[in-house]
Every structure is written in C-alpha cells, then in structure tokens.
C-alpha cells in the first residue's frame, strides 16, 4: 500500500521555505555529540528540515495547552495538562535515535529550557533476554511478542494520568539486555518516545499506544537503503564498541570479515528485514508525519497528515 492521499506532500525544496527563526539552530559541536554511528545528519538537515518541524510541534503543543485551559475553565477544574507525548517510529538503522536526540535538544532550545523535555526509548520495555530465551523467542527480539506490553501500557497510563513520578526501564545496547535499574521522570512537560514498535496496534489489547500520543513521526526509507545502513553500522561497531570483551557481540570480532558479513546478513534477512515488512512498515500511515530519507541519508520528502 502507498496511500498518502490524506497527507500533504512537501518535497524538501518546498518544506525548507517554511518561515522560521534561525536562532534555534544547533551548532556543529552539539550535532556531533548527539549524532549516531553512521548517521549522516547534517546542519543543513537541521536548518532545512528539523527547524520547521520543531516549530510545527511547538504550534501543536501550544494549541493543546490552550484547549486544555479552556476546557478546565469551562468545567471549573484546576487539573494541569498531562505531558505532551511525541512518538517516533521506524526501522532499525533508519536513524530514529539520532532524530529523537535532535528533537530533545531542539525543543529544549525552542522553549529556552522552560519546559521539561524527556526522552524515552521502548528498548527498555523489551523482556529481559532470560525471559526471551525461556519462551524460545530470542530470535524474535524486536517483534511485538518480545515486548512487555502491559508494562508499556502502564507507563503510558501513568503519564496521561498526570502521575508525578513515572518509572522508566533502561536498556543497554552494550550488553544487549534490559538493565535491572530504572530511572524516574518527575512531572515532564513533553515526552519523546522512540522505538520501532510505538505505532503498532494489537487487536487483542483494549488500549493502543497511539491513543496516548499527541504527535507521531515515522522515519521512512527504502528497505535496500536501510539494509545497507544496518550493515555499515554493524561493521563500524565491530571495529569499535564490539572490541570490548564485555560486549554481547564481542565474539563477532574474532571471526573473519566474511563470516561476520554472513552473520549480519542473516540477522537482517531473518529478523530485522522480516520485522520491518511484517510489523513496522505498515504503521507508517498511522503517523501524523512521515520523514522519507534518500540513499544519501538526506530527508527528501515530508508527508504531513491533513
């Protein structure tokens, strides 16, 4: 399906002409600090794509605050508004994590740090490896059944119920497992939730994650490009982070490059690629906005729900 009928289409050249102050732009040093491995996001992308997008999100945020205030005044209630939740979805290796960090830094800048902006990844809501192994679904890590959906639903419910302190589970890409410790969020104003599964719906669940989101973004690219980026990132990690003997993937530094390539291709063809086609890509049209990347990593097209 390729149904963008209910979206406005902005080619890059049109989107970049949207008026916005350049005062909020990031520096090269700030961008370098948050850029992910093998993610080629540039200051040009920040200026031409993300700055107009952040302004759009700010407009939506202020509109939500205004509507809530009007409603509370009419109902004669004094309850503050629940956090404004931004969802960011897309495949493994498409650049979600860097984009989420860009969102956080630019929203902090936009609101001059007068709003508390938090970033949460859904990796923390995976079942621990021990549970996945017990259930025989370690090779389905990242698929819908590998997530603790009850825990994720409680997290979202706590946020929207305006609970003062909300527990956030943590995940380590180094050990490739959920950590025992958690962190607490205290009264956030804006929460960015990033993960491959955030827009997925389970017909057997009474609550859909998307019910809780105020704005949602899907990072899109052609599968062949994403596969190439995944392989490039794998080999970069093989030369860096995987070299640490404590890394879950350290054994793959001890085999030949050809064997490592066979392993990485196998992971894509049997896990990540399958998950993209069966579960992730179909959520694209649930997003309020789709960012499409070209082969060069630059965002070429923006689709905004009408």
UniProtKB/Swiss-Prot annotation:
The keyword Cell membrane does not apply. Coiled coil: none annotated. One of its GO terms (cellular component) is cytoplasm. ATP binds at residues 90-97. It catalyses: (R)-pantothenate + ATP = (R)-4'-phosphopantothenate + ADP + H(+). It is an enzyme of class 2 (transferase). The keyword Transferase applies. It is found in: Cytoplasm. Its EC number is 2.7.1.33. Keywords: ATP-binding, Coenzyme A biosynthesis, Cytoplasm, Kinase, Nucleotide-binding, Transferase. Pfam families: PRK. One of its GO terms (molecular function) is ATP binding. GO terms for biological process: coenzyme A biosynthetic process. Pathway: Cofactor biosynthesis; coenzyme A biosynthesis; CoA from (R)-pantothenate: step 1/5. Its main location: cytoplasm. Belongs to the prokaryotic pantothenate kinase family. This is Pantothenate kinase. It comes from Listeria innocua serovar 6a (strain ATCC BAA-680 / CLIP 11262).
